[in-house]
């Protein structure tokens, strides 16, 4: 009788705990949107780069432009801090900065700007059509806004995390606590491919 009772209690305990495979992230889990992570752009070294160039790494994607006065450099500085906090695990983490300003963000300009945050960060650029296509894939708003003889670019800002199998999984809006971003990256790094 006691044995049946214990088995029943164990069964109830296991059912109550459940086998909930849903993962909890600090950022927004956008995996259900099935966004296309693929790309083919030129990196700041002048080489063509695709998603496969960063195979088996967790990737943080940020869209911005080098003349951005505040949000872009702040986000890149946070990503630098995040990479440092990851320690050795940071070797399996890649930051990609996608330029939304194909007119001004040349290879030369990106090759000076991006490494000033971290030498492992990669700046990517392309033609207007290539950049627009990639921004559309990621649902990133961007618009050129004239300002006297120059212009700025209004854009949505956030960090997209791509898992090691190449799927866009998480989006952290601008201003998200870095501790949450670090925890999400660590969780993605711990997943089997």
Model-derived features: positions:
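C-terminal motif of bacterial Sec signal peptides marking the signal peptidase cleavage site
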Residues: 13-16
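N-terminal "domain-start" segment that seeds a small globular fold
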Residues: 22-52, 77
């Amino acid at each position: 009788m006691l044995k049946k009772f214990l088995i029943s209690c164990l069964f109830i305990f296991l059912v109550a705990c459940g086998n909930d495979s849903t993962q909890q992230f600090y950022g927004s889990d956008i995996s259900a949107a099935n966004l296309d992570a693929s790309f083919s752009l030129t990196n700041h070294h002048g080489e063509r780069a695709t998603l496969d160039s960063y195979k088996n790494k967790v990737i943080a994607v940020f869209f911005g432009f080098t003349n951005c006065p505040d949000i872009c450099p702040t986000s890149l500085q946070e990503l630098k801090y995040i990479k440092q906090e990851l320690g050795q695990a940071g070797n399996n983490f890649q930051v990609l900065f996608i330029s939304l300003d194909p007119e001004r963000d040349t290879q030369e300009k990106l090759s000076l700007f991006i490494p000033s945050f971290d030498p492992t960060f990669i700046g990517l650029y392309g033609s207007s059509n290539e950049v627009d296509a990639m921004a559309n894939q990621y649902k990133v708003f961007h618009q050129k806004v004239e300002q006297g003889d120059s212009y700025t670019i209004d854009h949505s800002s956030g960090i997209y995390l791509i898992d090691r199998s190449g799927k866009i999984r998480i989006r952290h809006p601008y201003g998200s606590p870095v501790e949450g971003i670090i925890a999400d990256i660590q969780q993605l790094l711990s997943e089997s491919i």
